[in-house]
Amino acid sequence: MRNLKLHRTLEFRDIQAPGKPQCFCLRAEQGTVLIGSERGLTEVDPVRREVKTEISLVAEGFLPEDGSGCIVGIQDLLDQESVCVATASGDVIVCNLSTQQLECVGSVASGISVMSWSPDQELLLLATAQQTLIMMTKDFEVIAEEQIHQDDFGEGKFVTVGWGSKQTQFHGSEGRPTAFPVQLPENALPWDDRRPHITWRGDGQYFAVSVVCRQTEARKIRVWNREFALQSTSESVPGLGPALAWKPSGSLIASTQDKPNQQDVVFFEKNGLLHGHFTLPFLKDEVKVNDLLWNADSSVLAIWLEDLPKEDSSTLKSYVQLWTVGNYHWYLKQSLPFSTTGKNQIVSLLWDPVTPCRLHVLCTGWRYLCCDWHWTTDRSSGNSANDLANVAVIDGNRVLVTVFRQTVVPPPMCTYRLLIPHPVNQVIFSAHLGNDLAVLDASNQISVYKCGDKPNMDSTVKLGAVGGNGFKVPLTTPHLEKRYSIQFGNNEEEEEEEVNALQLSFLTWVEDDTFLAISYSHSSSQSIIHHLTVTHSEVDEEQGQLDVSSSVTVDGVVIGLCCCSKTKSLAVQLADGQVLKYLWESPSLAVEPWKNSEGIPVRFVHPCTQMEVATIGGEECVLGLTDRCRFFINDTEVASNITSFAVCDDFLLVTTHSHTCQVFSLSGASLKMLQAALSGSHEASGEILRKVERGSRIVTVVPQDTKLILQMPRGNLEVVHHRALVLAQIRKWLDKLMFKEAFECMRKLRINLNLIHDHNPKVFLENVETFVKQIDSVNHINLFFTELREEDVTKTMYPPPITKSVQVSTHPDGKKLDLICDAMRAAMEAINPRKFCLSILTSHVKKTTPELEIVLQKVQELQGNLPFDPESVSVEEALKYLLLLVDVNELFNHSLGTYDFNLVLMVAEKSQKDPKEYLPFLNTLKKMETNYQRFTIDKYLKRYEKALGHLSKCGPEYFTECLNLIKDKNLYKEALKLYRPDSPQYQAVSMAYGEHLMQEHLYEPAGLVFARCGAQEKALEAFLACGSWQQALCVAAQLQMSKDKVAGLARTLAGKLVEQRKHSEAATVLEQYAQDYEEAVLLLLEGSAWEEALRLVYKYDRVDIIETSVKPSILEAQKNYMDFLDSETATFIRHKNRLQVVRALRRQAPQVHVDHEVAHGPESDLFSETSSIMSGSEMSGRYSHSNSRISARSSKNRRKAERKKHSLKEGSPLEGLALLEALSEVVQSVEKLKDEVRAILKVLFLFEFEEQAKELQRAFESTLQLMERAVPEIWTPAGQQSSTTPVLGPSSTANSITASYQQQKTCVPALDAGVYMPPKMDPRSQWKLSLLE
């Protein structure tokens, strides 16, 4: 749905050269045009508007002096820096334009009709006046000569046995002669020049020749290959014209055919068979086709037509029409009228070989015209909700308009079409009223159509599709307000209009009665911006006039003009890339440079064919896209792979070469953020990016809606709802409390309904009643309930593109479901509890702890509803609905838990349960005593606490059963609450509880339980087992044990305490209860409690122990500390040095283990969006129970593997991590010795072991200093990020770069995260003894 829009026009008028122009060619590298006349060659530079070279062919005798000579072909030879010229007299001349030397490289005595070079300029083909073809090499050596008329069909002649042909078919009463009709050939057309026409395929492997057959006098097309072998001959086509053009892509050969009532452009295949056609918009014998030309990329077919003389026609015209094809329909996109007499008569036209949409035209009055077009989509501005998202497509004198807000129909169909008297060249939409449009036709008239409330249909507006017959049209179509002619006010402009068929370009509708347009000066590189203002007249209501109210001259060629519909800013782009701001609303009509935020004038590095003005982060910027897919924002190139873009509702939408569509919010964006996102340096989120079909382009975006219309290369349309547009629109609706619109959109597009609450929980909970009233559907509210989950989808599934400045309060207790269910239930009960009965039941079921008992009670209450109440729900309906939400067995069990057998029977009857299964069970229960009955029910339902409560009320005769239940289900704590402490049942339960704790090796709680119930012997046994010496000695005192038994008990307790490395407590027990202070001193020395040992020595006056035990123990401890420090220091230095080596190797070889890391990296992003339909809650619910055992086993294996993978073996994959762990352990072990070292330093100094004390203090200080200096080197920020920093550079590979980015995405495991943090060392710890310094 694209049109051709005039990009720029370059005109060189009144070229000063001799003779009359006959043909021309382009010199692409030099940027000049070489024109041939009956006098010679003239090279002109159209940009500088000067004649560069004149070469006379008359002086050398190649052309006659009387002016009767003719040049039939000119070709620029790129590799020879020369030009090849062929004359009608038969000479082939090579001319060096630098030296102006002429050389005749060959001559044909009979004369030359056509000269045609192959596209690769390796072969030259000449058609002679004797109806022969001569093929030559680029060095002008003759390869072969063949007759142009051939009797043979060619090498591609069809072989058939006749089955299915007309000759083998039954022809009824007409007889067999009808199988062989005699087809009389038609003569060539009267206006046929009868000359051969040659065209080459784009790759130069084949060429086609159209000639008039001598025998039949009708035209035929023959196809030859590069070896000059005839391949095929076309089928007989009556009325075949002389024009011939082979599509460069190689698929079709275009020609023309006169039919009885029309004139067609027909297409032939290489085998000579017809393959498609389209009809020209002219009557029979109205025009003739002089030439057909395909552009370089085969996207546009140019047709040069000329009016045939008629008796009643005084002025004849010629036309250049540009046709394109899409969805198998041919569109006339541009029509350029020229005259057939005077200076404006066309001599020849050529497509540019480099720029596909550039057309060169040469006229007889030495006037040269060069026009550049570019592809554009003419769509409405989309600045309001009333904009219908109109897109206009030009098709000759029709404008096909599609209203995408209401209908999506594929081209060439449309919503409605506008009928214009002349072919249309440009369509524009109003900048302030997007549904109004204006049409500029080939006669430079502007037809203005406006959307209003007129009831009468306009005759120039026709509905598409069924045409409205028998249907009510909900669409308001526009009506023709007036057709305006443009009045420039002087004859000079009118004369220029005769020469330049495209006088006006970039027509822009800025106000209701004001248009802007661009024209170009034919004498200098200047452009003129015209203000076209409506002249009000009461004479003619249908025909109006536009006057040029003012004009502004701009130095430079304008190649772009766009107006922002919101800010009314108008940007002008010049050919050199400079962007200007045109202050068209200012009284002075000034033009000033467009400046960025830094005050620097904006200049595009490359000319942009599409330009828009948008506000990005509060700054008005110019966006541009080149024909080479380079995308600019102001003067910054932000991407080089953009195929199309659009700006709508503060969003920027782009499609890329990687077949994605990305959407960015411009309100809070910045230029750097957009550049980073579009360059691919940051991974795009799921909301921004969407995969699209290959080659998709943006057609339009429906304003304030979610629809994005894309067009595929073959022409069909696709409507997508981009996630970013959808979420943005939903957020707007939720902010406006338009819950119904948001809900319908989310339901249709499968957006998780949790977003309704999570977008703003506080606002939603305050407006729950509004939500219920707007939805007003039990089914939809139930759907909302079923999708609720505790997850905050604004943090997981749909994070906002811009972080909110005000954080919305969440639910810290994680009871989101309960809050919503309670609020919704209260609102529904207040509005209409009978209507929303099923939804109220759902609110109870969906709570974190389903309230099934309450649900069943509410169902039971429904029995009182009136049967004729239309809004009420019956018990049967409610139960059937509940069975959809809850498992039937679970519902049956909960109904049984209410102890109401009527409710149980009601649930069972609605389920699929067999009465033989539940009736005997229920009958048995009914016969039991109430408490025992409820105990049986609770036990059946595994509600053992309730069952115990009911059983305890059954009496002492059931205590044995009760005690067994307590033991089986470990209900000791609950049972102790049910009996009085002085009861025998309490004692029995306590004894059983204590025995249970002893079996579980929980000795201290068991001792407390035994002590509480008076079982002192068992309590002493328990306290003794756990080493609780205070409690054990207390119990011993209560048992009134003798001193000897207490001493023995004390020794036993001391042994237990020593095993637990509690030497000080063991010494206290021996000293106070066994009176064995010598053994107590030895235990204190063993536990390094030096000062406490000395206290006991002096307390009991046993100074001799100092020499025998204390001093040797102190010296031995000092020696052990020295050995430990030496070992730890050596280990620390070894690991530190190895870590440096490992890090150096990693920097040198970043690709180590890359393949393993990539293979186990994050999952690939190659799945389609529709593959994630099943929600996470559904999958977790399906597999959580069955896989619990597997999960436990796999987690155990993972922990085991986690321990094994951190190996200190050199070369292991995670050696660096293992070294960090080992170094951290060494530092922590040394740090823990500070208090112990200070204690031993004091006693060493006390007993005059000063040298040993100084040695230990120096060694410990040296070790600590070594570690303090090394910690910043080992645990550096760069070292922490080295594993996640992308590895780039000349030594990197594809795998290494991929792995580094995969590591960026992967979080550090929780087990490894602490390794990257340096161990804590307290420099303020006072461990040193100042007396030793």
UniProtKB/Swiss-Prot annotation:
Region feature Disordered, mapped onto this chain: 1175-1209
Pathway recorded for this protein: tRNA modification; 5-methoxycarbonylmethyl-2-thiouridine-tRNA biosynthesis
Sequence ranges of Basic residues compositional bias: 1195-1207
Region (Mediates dimerization): 886-1333
Cellular localisation: Cytoplasm; Nucleus
Any one cellular-component term (Gene Ontology): cytosol
Pfam families tied to this protein: A-sol_ELP1, Beta-prop_ELP1_1st, Beta-prop_ELP1_2nd, HB_ELP1, TPR_ELP1
GO biological process: tRNA wobble uridine modification
UniProt note: phenotype after gene disruption: Conditional knockout in male germ cells results in defects in wobble uridine tRNA modification and defects in synapsis and meiotic recombination which result in increased apoptosis and complete arrest of gametogenesis, leading to male infertility. Conditional knockout in female germ cells results in female subfertility with reduced litter size although ovaries are morphologically and histologically indistinguishable from those of controls.
Modified positions (Phosphoserine) in chain numbering: 805, 1172, 1175
Residues covered by region (Required for binding to tRNA): 1192-1210
Highest taxon of source: Eukaryota
Tissue and organ distribution: In the testis, expression is restricted to germ cells during spermatogenesis with no expression detected in somatic cells such as Sertoli cells or Leydig cells (at protein level). In the ovary, expressed in oocytes of primary, secondary and antral follicles (at protein level). Widely expressed in adult tissues with highest levels in brain and also expressed at all embryonic stages.
Keywords: Cytoplasm, Nucleus, Phosphoprotein, tRNA processing
Post-translational note: Phosphorylated.
Main location: cytoplasm
Summary of the function given for this chain in its UniProt record: Component of the elongator complex which is required for multiple tRNA modifications, including mcm5U (5-methoxycarbonylmethyl uridine), mcm5s2U (5-methoxycarbonylmethyl-2-thiouridine), and ncm5U (5-carbamoylmethyl uridine). The elongator complex catalyzes the formation of carboxymethyluridine in the wobble base at position 34 in tRNAs. Regulates the migration and branching of projection neurons in the developing cerebral cortex, through a process depending on alpha-tubulin acetylation. ELP1 binds to tRNA, mediating interaction of the elongator complex with tRNA.
Subunit structure: Homodimer; dimerization promotes ELP1 stability and elongator complex formation. Component of the elongator complex which consists of ELP1, ELP2, ELP3, ELP4, ELP5 and ELP6. Interacts preferentially with MAP3K14/NIK followed by IKK-alpha and IKK-beta.
Entry similarity comment: Belongs to the ELP1/IKA1 family.
Protein name: Elongator complex protein 1
Organism: Mus musculus
Source taxonomy: Eukaryota, Metazoa, Chordata, Craniata, Vertebrata
